[in-house]
Amino acid sequence: MAKIGILTCSNATQDLGCSSVSCLADFRKRKETFSEYPEDEKLTSAGIINCPGCPTLTSPDKLIERIRALTNFGVDTIHFTYCVKSLCPFKEKYKDSLEESFPNIRIVIGTHEEHIAPEEFRRRVKKLFRQPRKTMVDIILNKDEEA
C-alpha cells in the first residue's frame, strides 16, 4: 500500500482558493503521476499540507517540519502539486532538502494532468494576483462596498 502526502502551494490554496480538486481527482483515477503506481497497489492519502510560504531559500526547516508531521503517519511518497511544479522557484531545493532529511520517502514533482501549459498557467496566475482586492482596511474606511 502506498501512503501518499500532497504538498500544495500556499499562495495557490490560501490566496487564490485552489482546493486541490484536480490533484485529488487524478489521485482517485490513478492518472498522470499517480499512474506510476502498480494497479494492484492500494493508494492511500495520508494528508495534504501547504508549503510554509515563499521564500525559504536559505532554510527549508519549516517545510521539513511540515513533512515530518506526515511521516508520523507512515507516508512513503510526497507529491508536489502542479501549482508547486509550475510556480515555485524553490521546488528543486525543497526536493533535495526533503530527500536528504527523509531518505526513505520518495519525492514526486507533479500530481494532475497539465490542462494548461506551465507558461500560460504562470501568466494567468500572475494576472489573478494583480487583481484589486478588498481587505479589512476597506471595511474600516467604509470602502468595502464601492464598485
Language-model segments: what does each one mean?
Residues 92, 99, 122-124:
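A generic membrane alpha-helix/interface feature
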Residues 1-70, 84, 105, 113, ...:
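Conserved mixed alpha/beta catalytic, RNA-binding, or beta-rich assembly cores of soluble enzyme
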Residues 60-92, 96:
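Mid-chain, well-packed structural core segment of small domains
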Residues 98-107:
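Alpha-helix-loop-beta-strand connector modules within alpha/beta enzyme cores
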